[in-house]
């Protein structure tokens, strides 16, 4: 953290001290290895002398028994709480009155006034007054802590000075998201895959990773819970962990209205570092690209997974009107060239007029003539008003034995 000073006068009666408050760390321990079965006992004797000098009773552990204060200004990461102690010291031989301290934090986009209780106080000679201030860091990039001091001497002269402390803020984690839509799922479910990477230089433990959905969706977390679920939440530097969420429409009776929705929700993450310092981040609103279904959408509602050869079976289908106008639809069936599955239902059947955001159900009778995995194709839908044709192939696969 670099420091700059701006004074209204070169002779100041007060001095300003700013110290960042951070948690200590365990002192590293230089272990001494010796052979426990050494017949001479020299190694054990030497290890005992080392323990006596270092005041450490255990040399078989990677960390010591003592804590050490931070030796330098360490990195500050987005989502953490920046805590510092600001102290105004009267270094003169006379008292000063009406001492007021103002602390501001300036970023590239805003200037935040931090709460400070040092206002209109009197500081006697060689005395001081200060306060601990905390602020949650919500932006990355260069930050400037501005501390301004106003006071008055006993002779009535108004004095003023301020100090600037610059420090950078980095990203502790990197979040990448991917959206998946099940094309054959009429419920308009959306799957979100979130990849979280530890971009800091220290270990972190993910306490919570949740998806706060928008008002149109409800969310279900899909995670694999093993015998030790906490182990997978520990992220070392550059480690990546994946999370999967399923978002389902709240209004199950109008799933077609969800096809144009792009706002999904926000990811909310919280973690702790190796010494228990807490961090929290929330992403901006996640946006997905709405899938394009065209004017009509065909889905298979019910079909057997396995059938016997030369035994007919039925496939239940549902046709949605995804357009903004009514459609007059007709069903035509084309037999595939390989004829491994023969559709026995009549062709040219009228499905009637279908209003917007509505659906119509129909069934297909299929006769399998060859074994293996066979695909159902040849479904043709015609809008008799506009003469537009919609082709649907490979709508389902059946195993014929």
Curated annotation (Swiss-Prot):
Transmembrane segments: none
Cellular component aspect of the GO annotation: TRAPPIII protein complex
Family: Belongs to the TRAPPC13 family.
Name of the protein: Probable trafficking protein particle complex subunit 13 homolog
Species per Swiss-Prot/TrEMBL record: Caenorhabditis briggsae
Lineage of the species this protein comes from: Eukaryota, Metazoa, Ecdysozoa, Nematoda, Chromadorea
